């Protein structure tokens, strides 16, 4: 094996040869053999091999393999030097291979190495985006689990940093095509990341692009299958997919398939849903999603049937007034509970779909049923007025910091809920019922949000290797507003301020897209 002096001497031969470098194959071979030497020889080889690589195409495989040996050296400084120089090997047909190698090197736990690998990948991305994507997706589809995970996170965090001249329409089409292959077998967490990747592509910002994404989500949600409320994996899949679909819906991209599925398959099973996440009010979560989607529902095939299912579910949460004894006191032991959070969602959804069949209450219900509904509305409205007054009194004069306490935050949300229900009930009391009022759902921001705007999410953009996510999503403690006890004592329900989109579990541990474990070793 060559000494340091021999390496320098052969480096000099190549450096002085200028245009005739390719004639000194023996000198380059000496430098390649430097990877078999000691620490000093390896450091020199890591720098010299890439410098003259392009002049010796017949030694390309040997040169790349020599550099890879250095990328796996026990000495961290040698590894870092070798990784830093890898982009110089990314020429012509070698680029996809280098991209594949760099993708595998993402599995390092050394933060400096991880940074170098990221930078090297970005560097070759700018040389040839398609070739780089070939290497990345090759590992996502066939590589080890840790490599797959980090390659997906690389795409989800780094693609958006690349300029338009790199992410051309053709490149984005390749990303979509390859992503569809991956989506045939993914976990929930991976699915969320891919939706983040795809929804950020410029070519998918159009109406037709958004429609493509909705179809991808619908396919992932298995909307053709019968819903199994007792299977937490089935429930989790539907929730995750619907959360990804909601920001995509607009007046031009309809939610009809999802709303139909919720009305036909989920609402009838609402009380038997198995929660996939401990501490989550699964029924309220489902009703919130339905309410958000109902605004963008198009023409529905079985509108009357589904509206009736929604109406029947609403009645379950709109109690009749308690019977009074002869002395005027409540004959029962307990007042009915008024579940305002649930009613806001159901009433809003009914109000939205009712616009499409405005004579439902007057022509489709018999007189007795309509009378019963109005009694329930009236009773609920009376209880509502009591709480609205109590909430306004509790918040009166409070501004700034005073409104930021947890207790007052909950009361502010409670006031939004009760005000929303009040507006919707007034509409339905009209003769004939009206569907003209507009309200903003209590958990939605008041300011206008652009159609298709993505929800904020945490990025892995630091220079350190991503840490493994915890098994369960981080959620704020449930916040329940308990109004003062009295004639209309009730719970307003749970107010979850957490951002949606977290997924419980990882590949190999859950049924949704669980992938077989593979041990593949070095694939360079």
Swiss-Prot record:
Function (record text): Antiapoptotic factor that may have a role in protein assembly. Negatively regulates ACIN1. By binding to ACIN1, it suppresses ACIN1 cleavage from CASP3 and ACIN1-mediated DNA fragmentation. Also known to efficiently suppress E2F1-induced apoptosis. Its depletion enhances the cytotoxic action of the chemotherapeutic drugs.
Biased composition (Polar residues): 487-497
Phosphoserine: modified positions: 462, 464, 469
Region annotation ARM-like and Heat-like helical repeats: where it falls in the sequence: 2-360
Region (Leucine-zipper): 370-391
UniProt modified residues of type N6-acetyllysine: 251
Modified sites of kind Omega-N-methylarginine: 500
UniProt keyword Methyltransferase, yes or no: no
Protein name stated in the entry: Apoptosis inhibitor 5
Modified residues (Phosphothreonine): 399
A single GO cellular-component term on record: nuclear speck
Domain notes: Two regions, an N-terminal (aa 96-107) and a C-terminal (aa 274-311) are required for binding FGF2.
Biased composition (Low complexity): 462-472
Nuclear localization signal, short sequence motif: residues: 454-475
Quaternary structure, from the entry: Monomer. Interacts with FGF2 and ACIN1.
Biological process per Gene Ontology, one example term: negative regulation of fibroblast apoptotic process
Compartments in which it is found: Nucleus; Cytoplasm
An MF annotation (GO) of this entry: RNA binding
Location, primary (coarse class): nucleus
Name of the encoding gene: API5
Record family assignment: Belongs to the API5 family.
Tissues where the protein occurs: Expressed in all tissues tested, including heart, brain, placenta, lung, liver, skeletal muscle, kidney and pancreas. Highest levels in heart, pancreas and placenta. Highly expressed in several cancers. Preferentially expressed in squamous cell carcinoma versus adenocarcinoma in non-small cell lung cancer.
Keyword list, A-Z: Acetylation, Apoptosis, Cytoplasm, Methylation, Nucleus, Phosphoprotein, Repeat
């Amino acid at each position: 094996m060559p000494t340091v002096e021999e390496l320098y001497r052969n480096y000099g031969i190549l450096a002085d040869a200028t245009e005739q470098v390719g004639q000194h194959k023996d000198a380059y071979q000496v430098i390649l053999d430097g990877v078999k030497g000691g620490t000093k020889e390896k450091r020199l080889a890591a720098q010299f091999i890439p410098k003259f690589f392009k002049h010796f195409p017949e030694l390309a495989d040997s040169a790349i393999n020599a550099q890879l040996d250095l990328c796996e050296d026990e000495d961290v400084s040698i590894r870092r030097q070798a990784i830093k120089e890898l982009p110089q090997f990314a020429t012509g047909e070698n680029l996809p291979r280098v991209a594949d190698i760099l993708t595998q090197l993402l599995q390092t736990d050394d933060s400096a190495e991880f940074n170098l690998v990221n930078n090297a990948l970005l560097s070759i991305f700018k040389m040839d985006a398609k070739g780089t994507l070939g290497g990345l997706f090759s590992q996502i589809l066939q590589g080890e689990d840790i490599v797959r995970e980090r390659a997906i996170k690389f795409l989800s965090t780094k693609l958006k940093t690349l300029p338009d001249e790199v992410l051309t329409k053709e490149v984005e089409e390749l990303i979509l095509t390859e992503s569809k292959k991956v989506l045939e077998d993914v976990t929930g967490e991976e699915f969320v990341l891919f939706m983040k990747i795809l929804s950020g592509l410029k070519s998918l910002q159009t109406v037709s692009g958004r429609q493509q994404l909705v179809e991808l989500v619908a396919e992932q949600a298995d909307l053709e299958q019968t819903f199994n409320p007792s299977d937490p994996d089935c429930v989790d899949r539907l929730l995750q997919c619907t959360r990804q679909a909601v920001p995509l819906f607009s007046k031009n991209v309809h939610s009809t398939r999802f709303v139909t599925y919720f009305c036909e398959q989920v609402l009838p099973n609402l009380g038997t849903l198995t929660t996939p996440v401990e501490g989550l009010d699964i029924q309220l979560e489902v009703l919130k999603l339905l309410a958000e989607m109902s605004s963008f529902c198009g023409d529905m095939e079985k509108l009357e049937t589904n509206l009736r299912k929604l109406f029947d579910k609403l009645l379950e949460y709109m109690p009749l007034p308690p019977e009074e004894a002869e002395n005027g006191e409540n004959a029962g032991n307990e007042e009915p509970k008024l579940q305002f959070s649930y009613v806001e969602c159901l009433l809003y959804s009914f109000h939205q779909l009712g616009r499409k069949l405005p004579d439902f209450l007057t022509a489709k219900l018999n007189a007795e049923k309509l009378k019963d509904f109005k009694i329930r509305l009236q009773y609920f409205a009376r209880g509502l007025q009591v709480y609205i007054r109590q909430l306004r009194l509790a918040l009166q004069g409070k501004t700034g910091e005073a409104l930021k306490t947890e207790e007052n935050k909950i009361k502010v949300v409670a006031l939004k809920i009760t005000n929303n229900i009040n507006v919707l009930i007034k509409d339905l009391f009209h003769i004939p019922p009206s569907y003209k009022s507009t309200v903003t759902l209590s958990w939605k921001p008041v300011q206008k949000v652009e159609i298709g705007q993505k929800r904020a999410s945490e990025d892995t953009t630091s220079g350190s290797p991503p840490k493994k996510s915890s098994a369960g999503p981080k959620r704020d403690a449930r916040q329940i507003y308990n109004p003062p006890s009295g004639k209309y004592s009730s719970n307003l329900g749970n107010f979850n301020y957490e951002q949606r989109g977290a997924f419980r579990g990882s590949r190999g541990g859950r049924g949704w897209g669980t992938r077989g474990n593979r041990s593949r070793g070095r694939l360079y």
